[in-house]
UniProtKB/Swiss-Prot annotation:
Keyword Hydrolase assigned: yes
Gene: CPD1
GO molecular function: 2',3'-cyclic-nucleotide 3'-phosphodiesterase activity
Enzyme Commission number(s) from the entry: 3.1.4.37
The organism of origin for this protein: Candida glabrata (strain ATCC 2001 / BCRC 20586 / JCM 3761 / NBRC 0622 / NRRL Y-65 / CBS 138)
Keywords annotated in UniProt: Golgi apparatus, Hydrolase
Reaction equations catalysed: a nucleoside 2',3'-cyclic phosphate + H2O = a nucleoside 2'-phosphate + H(+)
Main subcellular location of this protein, as a coarse class: Golgi
Function: Involved in the metabolism of ADP-ribose 1',2'-cyclic phosphate which is produced as a consequence of tRNA splicing.
Enzyme class: hydrolase
Protein name per UniProt: 2',3'-cyclic-nucleotide 3'-phosphodiesterase
Transmembrane segments: none
């Protein structure tokens, strides 16, 4: 999967604790599902070679966030779904917030689509970028009975923050090496704003 840019709720916040508990509880329903930190993947395939490059990515994220109106939340859940893809087996779908889209497009222009970046990044953000928070990574088929339990657990979790995560919770960017098994992924750098 390469190197990714994650946007995360800060540990200890309601959003982090609710999502982490939800991820762990769903993991118990389907054997072989790894545990991972709550996050929204902004972009993958970052072109970073060293710590200096990681710092530039995080500095760019920090600068972008400063342009967003205070109190505005980039993360707003719109739905949830079960999919066939391993990394999107169960997800909370997020609205395509204009600031989130701008952030994703800019990061892709600067650090992924190095050549002919603007046109490709514009196409990607409109046609391919599906903002979401993964709740499970797995290849297994989800049974109807498990789906009913998943539905109830997600519903219960969403009631805790009324489908509106606090803009104060989501404030950490991480550059993550996503090579090998999920348990071996490494955070190369992070910034909390």
């Amino acid at each position: 999967m390469s190197i990714a840019l994650w946007y995360c709720p800060a540990p200890g916040t309601l959003d982090y604790e609710v999502l982490k508990t939800l991820i762990n509880s769903l993991q118990l329903l389907v054997p072989g599902s790894p545990s991972f930190e709550p996050h929204l993947t902004v972009v993958t395939h970052l072109q970073v070679q060293n710590r200096g490059d990681v710092s530039k990515v995080l500095q760019s994220c920090s600068s972008c966030l400063k342009t967003i109106p205070k109190g505005h939340s980039l993360i707003k859940y719109s739905n949830w779904s079960i999919n066939k893809q391993y990394f999107k087996k169960i997800v909370l779908e997020c609205e395509k917030d204009k600031y989130l889209l701008s952030l994703a497009q800019l990061m892709r222009e600067l650090y992924v689509e190095i050549e002919d970046q603007k046109r490709r990044a514009e196409h990607w953000v409109i046609e391919e970028f599906q903002p979401h928070v993964s709740l499970m990574y797995n290849d297994s088929q989800i049974t109807k009975a498990t789906e009913m339990v998943v539905r109830q657990r997600i519903h219960d979790a969403m009631q805790l923050f009324s489908n509106n995560p606090s803009s104060k919770s989501w404030r950490t960017f991480k550059v993550v090496s996503c090579e090998g098994p999920v348990e071996e992924w490494q955070v190369l750098g992070s910034v909390t704003l």
